[in-house]
């Protein structure tokens, strides 16, 4: 059993270390992670410069690229055979709702899914001290279920864990992605030279109320498990947009005629 572990917080992140150690009881663990923090790297791929790989230990590699780069290098080059399972995390901070669109943690799991590897993103609530041991225990439990039962096609698991001791967590809930609102997400400042610069930041002020919302599970002390599908097509809206297929195209005869060379007139 071969397990690939990666993240977006970097190779030296405590969450990565704790997760890899916990998974060593399940199978042979390979760690391939960015050489520095790559938070909010989303699904970026490095195309215009070479990637450097440094081996830091037995089956432990640091990559000078994004989380998605790490997954590609690991699955397609570094590992002797593709892994049976991929886990990305444990991320410092939750990846709930809209966060998944920006998260390098979740994107690494998405890339694993694209490459045909059953994958799970693991994130933990908090900002200072983290109960990564509790997060790792839940991650291992879900990982065993994935290995036993598999995942639906093109589907990954987004696991978020409240920052509590293991015995204080109230269980696991299957949830949906929620929506959030921010207050003043762009901060404008002036540097000592009088030039304007910006921080993309802001304070989350509310979550949308929806059935089985992921953030509500975390607020109530439960682990949030959200299945995410790669196909983001809004299938329910296809019929509505099909009427746009009747938008008039240029008259074929007129287009053909305009492309024909004009005959020379006799003088």
Give the ranges of each region predicted by the language model:
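A cross-family phosphate/adenosyl-ligand binding-site feature
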Residues: 3, 14-77, 81-82
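Short beta-strand segments
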Residues: 6, 32-34, 64, 88-91, ...
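Glycine-rich phosphate/pyrophosphate-binding loops
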Residues: 113-135
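Hydrophobic/aromatic ligand-binding patch that stacks against planar heteroaromatic rings
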Residues: 108-112
